[in-house]
Regions:
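The feature marks the mature, well-folded catalytic cores of soluble enzymes
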Residues: 1-299
Length: 299
């Protein structure tokens, strides 16, 4: 069993470009289109938000490994193409959008290989239109070896099953419905797993699967229920991080923090020393992702 759920070390990518990715808007119903003439303005705002968030995490004792993105990768700010493990191995995953596949740069892989050994590189599956977008597709309960996942155009059901079986994770798979009536594109939109508490929106889980998921998440954790409306404010896109002395904190956007009610915040603060939040308005608006999407744990 894994010794810990969260990490003190986080990987982030400072984007070279940032705008609404036309290659992902078909499945990501949380991003807004951007006009070409707005690109520089959007990037400038996103960079301010990025650095403020990074500085906020570092100020609270989180160690950040930050690399710079490349041209042609508007979603480089969301490094969810790999996963690391406590045995110092890493796995690289198949991405749906072509410009997201380019995010796996030799420089980034080489840097990660200074710490981790590549156990599997599943990029070849992209040629077969089989996708499983790492920690966005799969929400890990690392301590209890459970993967939570909702199949979608970016999360192939068969490969998800195969991966969990080979890596000895118990899979809890369920169908979801977004505010548009389609599948929610990434599982980390609707839930996160902490050491003591799981935040999840049962409202967006299909009724046939809901009770089963409720039982599963309640086995080892306190559960914080998030509403469907709060999902639109990215309340589910949060991540537990470790500060100095192993203090556990929850990272999210200021929009998500503002959308939580007083009771929810009080519950979270029983399990966390602090809720770290930063303004990610531009990144959320045009990227369709929030705090968790920007952070990849280094175990």
């Amino acid at each position: 069993m894994s010794a810990k759920q969260s990490s003190n070390k986080i990987f982030m990518v400072e984007p070279r470009e940032f705008y609404s990715n036309p290659q992902t808007e078909g499945s990501n119903h949380y991003q807004m289109k951007s006009a070409n003439d707005e690109k520089q303005l959007i990037l400038d705002k996103a960079l301010i938000e990025f650095h403020n968030f990074k500085n906020n995490l570092e100020k609270n004792g989180v160690e950040i490994l930050c690399l710079k993105g490349i041209e042609g990768c508007p979603d480089h700010i969301f490094p969810n193409w790999f996963t690391t493990f406590e045995d110092k191995t890493m796995q690289i995953f198949p991405m749906n959008a072509e410009n997201r596949r380019k995010e796996k740069t030799p420089e980034m892989i080489n840097k990660l290989c200074e710490i981790y050994k590549i156990q599997n590189d599943f990029s070849y599956l992209e040629l077969e239109d089989i996708f499983l977008e790492s920690t966005s597709s799969m929400v890990f309960d690392r301590v209890n070896r459970i993967v939570y996942a909702t199949p979608s155009p970016r999360t192939n059901k068969q490969f998800l099953n195969e991966w969990c079986e080979k890596n000895e994770y118990d899979l809890c798979s369920f169908k979801t419905v977004s505010h548009t009536g389609s599948d929610i594109y990434h599982t980390d939109v609707l839930m996160y797993v902490g050491t003591e508490i799981i935040g999840i929106s049962f409202d967006v889980i299909d009724e046939k699967d809901r009770d089963r998921v409720k039982k599963k998440v309640s086995l080892n954790h306190k559960v914080l229920e998030i509403t469907a409306d709060q999902i639109l404010d990215f309340c589910g896109n949060s991540l537990e991080v470790e500060g100095e002395s192993g203090n556990l904190m929850l990272a999210m956007s200021s929009r998500a923090y503002s959308a939580l009610d007083t009771e929810q915040k009080d519950i979270l603060l029983k399990h966390y020393k602090k809720i770290i939040h930063s303004d990610l308005t531009t990144i959320e608006k045009y990227g369709g992702g929030s705090a968790r999407c920007m952070l990849s744990e280094l175990f």
